[in-house]
């Protein structure tokens, strides 16, 4: 019989191997039992790892303990001892890959780190379950994608276990390592989001919901229930709100029994979950399952008096809705065993007009329901029409305001320009081209160009002054009158501009004289073409604008008399598409 001490020494021994010429690396794991009678160490197990390669072959013998034959890496991972785990990996690599390169050492570490116990649990799963972040980080450094995604015999991988246990930091670290881990499935097609939502781990759920491109919120188990079903059933209101914020239509999804999340919520006792679901979609309160049960029927059968009271306060709840068995909620309440909850539920139902199925007058109820629906539809349409009229009135008011502001800006601009024209014209008469004689008379007073300059400069001066007088005299307030005034003063400003141009051309002839006649002609040509082009274009748009207004006025009159033609409508639509306004 071998003593305990010698047996333990044997378990920790390192046995060197012989030279092997095989290429590549092959990993073999063998379990041995060291049973030597009834000693305590005789029940221990040994794991021997052999790695063959281009260098030496080594065998690393490690002690395994516990019910599932955990290795020393499992023990370190469960205890959160990152240092011990690091030393165990280094010892295994040094023992097995003796004399080989760095890649061989890392391959040994990868194989040792991914080694499961008899329950199929890797050290990463053990560390993730207990939330040891440093150990998880250390293991992720050595594991490949297959090792990270390894599942235990229950069908859960490390990320799934961490999400189920609410290890937010571990889940975040593993998602940073590989986002695709969030799409793995456990038993019965359970996703990590479903496990976290069922356990009520809000932070983990919000973290998983950030992965928008994976569609995690749409994933459901084999029975058709998604994460909202389970969160609602367990009464996790914050998770329910987070899921509905992500996808409000999730409230209408049903499982294979036809149950929505509201059916699951009324089986619990949390009224806040019920309110959150109804706020997202009020119509779900009357959605039936495959047996015709609404949320009210389920809550009554589960004897949830408070839930029944909340449901009956909702406007969309039909207290006498029938199941496929032609039973109302009151029929279900009467069939319950006599107790305080069932009596309270019957009282609540009676207060809201609940009846037995045999007491229902189906034609009368159907007619009443139809009339009610028509009234609701009419009320909705009237309300919508009122809102539309209000919006149109607001838009029209805003347009009038903008129109008035545009006219005010135009009048202010015209006033400034008119003052400028008047100033230039007034100053020009005292700085006569060619100068003055000693008696103050202009030297070129007999020239025709001077007479042209003098006359048109005076017209420009008095026209501009007239515009200024009109602008400072007219009282603001009437948009239509202001528009007419602006049209008149704009024409006066056109006249002032033309006169100023002619005055400038005439002064050019005075100053340049006969020696530079070509320069005066060039100035005349430039000024004439510019003013003629601008005024001609503006005249075209003014005429076009007036024509468009006449067409619209004619169309309005024809609509009132009911004699509008297809041709008029076509012409109007074309003018409305090409509106150009000119004052």
UniProtKB/Swiss-Prot annotation:
Subcellular location field: Cell membrane
UniProt keyword Repeat, yes or no: yes
PROSITE patterns referenced in this protein's UniProt entry, alphabetically: ANK_REP_REGION, ANK_REPEAT
GO cellular component: plasma membrane
Matching Pfam families: Ank_2 (PF12796), PGG (PF13962)
Membrane topology: Multi-pass membrane protein
Source domain of life: Eukaryota
Keyword field: ANK repeat, Cell membrane, Membrane, Repeat, Stress response, Transmembrane, Transmembrane helix
Residues that span the membrane, as ranges: 414-434, 452-472, 492-512, 518-538
Protein's job: Involved in salt stress tolerance.
Protein name per the record: Ankyrin repeat-containing protein NPR4
Organism expressing this protein natively: Oryza sativa subsp. japonica
């Amino acid at each position: 019989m071998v003593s305990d001490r010698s047996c333990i020494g044997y378990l920790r021994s390192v046995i060197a191997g012989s030279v092997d010429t095989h290429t590549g690396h092959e990993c073999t794991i063998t379990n041995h039992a060291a049973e030597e009678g009834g000693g305590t160490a005789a029940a221990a197990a040994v794991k021997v790892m052999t790695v063959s390669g281009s260098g030496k072959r080594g065998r690393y013998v490690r002690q395994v303990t516990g019910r599932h034959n955990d290795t020393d890496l499992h023990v370190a991972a469960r205890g959160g001892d990152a240092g011990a785990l690091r030393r165990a990996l280094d010892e295994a690599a040094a023992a097995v890959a003796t004399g080989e390169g760095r890649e061989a050492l890392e391959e040994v570490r990868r194989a040792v780190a991914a080694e499961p116990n008899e329950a199929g649990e890797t050290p990463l799963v053990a560390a993730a379950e207990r939330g040891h972040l440093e150990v998880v980080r250390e293991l992720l450094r050595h594991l490949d994608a297959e090792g990270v995604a390894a599942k235990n015999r229950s069908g859960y991988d490390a990320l799934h276990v961490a999400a189920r246990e609410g290890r937010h930091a571990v889940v975040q670290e593993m998602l940073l390592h590989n986002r695709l881990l969030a799409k793995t499935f456990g038993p019965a097609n359970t996703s990590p989001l479903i496990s976290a939502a069922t356990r009520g781990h809000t932070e983990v759920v919000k973290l998983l919901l950030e992965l928008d491109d994976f569609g995690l919120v749409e994933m459901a188990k084999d029975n058709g229930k998604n994460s909202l079903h389970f969160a609602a059933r367990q009464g996790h209101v914050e998770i329910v709100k987070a899921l509905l914020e992500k996808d409000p239509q999730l409230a209408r999804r049903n499982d294979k029994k036809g149950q929505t999340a509201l059916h699951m919520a009324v089986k619990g006792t949390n009224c806040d979950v019920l309110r959150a679901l109804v706020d997202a979609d009020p119509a779900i309160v009357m959605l039936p399952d495959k047996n015709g049960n609404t949320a009210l029927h389920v809550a009554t059968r589960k004897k949830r008096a408070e839930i029944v009271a909340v449901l009956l306060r909702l406007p969309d709840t039909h207290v006498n809705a029938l199941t496929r068995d032609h039973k109302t909620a009151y029929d279900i309440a009467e069939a319950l065993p006599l107790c305080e909850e069932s009596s309270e539920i019957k009282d609540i139902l009676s207060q809201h007009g609940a009846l037995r199925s045999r007491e229902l007058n189906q034609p009368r109820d159907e007619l009443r329901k139809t009339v009610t629906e028509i009234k609701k539809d009419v009320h909705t349409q009237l309300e919508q029409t009122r809102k539309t009229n209000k919006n149109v009135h607001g838009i029209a008011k805003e347009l009038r305001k903008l129109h008035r502001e545009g006219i005010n800006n135009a009048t202010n601009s015209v006033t400034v320009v008119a003052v400028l024209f008047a100033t230039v014209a007034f100053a020009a008469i005292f700085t006569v081209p060619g100068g003055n004689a000693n008696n103050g008379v202009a030297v070129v007073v007999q020239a025709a160009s001077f007479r042209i300059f003098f006359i048109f400069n005076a017209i420009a001066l008095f026209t501009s002054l007239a515009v200024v007088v009109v602008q400072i005299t007219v009282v603001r307030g009437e948009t239509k009158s202001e528009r007419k005034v602006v049209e008149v003063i704009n024409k006066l400003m056109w006249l002032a501009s033309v006169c100023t141009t002619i005055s400038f051309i005439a002064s050019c002839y005075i100053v340049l004289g006969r020696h530079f006649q070509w320069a005066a002609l060039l100035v005349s040509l430039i000024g004439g073409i510019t003013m003629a082009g601008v005024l001609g274009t503006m005249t075209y748009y003014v005429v076009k604008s007036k024509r468009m207004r006449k067409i619209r006025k004619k169309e309005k009159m024809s609509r009132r008399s009911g004699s509008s033609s297809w041709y008029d409508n076509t012409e109007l639509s074309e003018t409305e598409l090409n509106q150009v306004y000119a004052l």
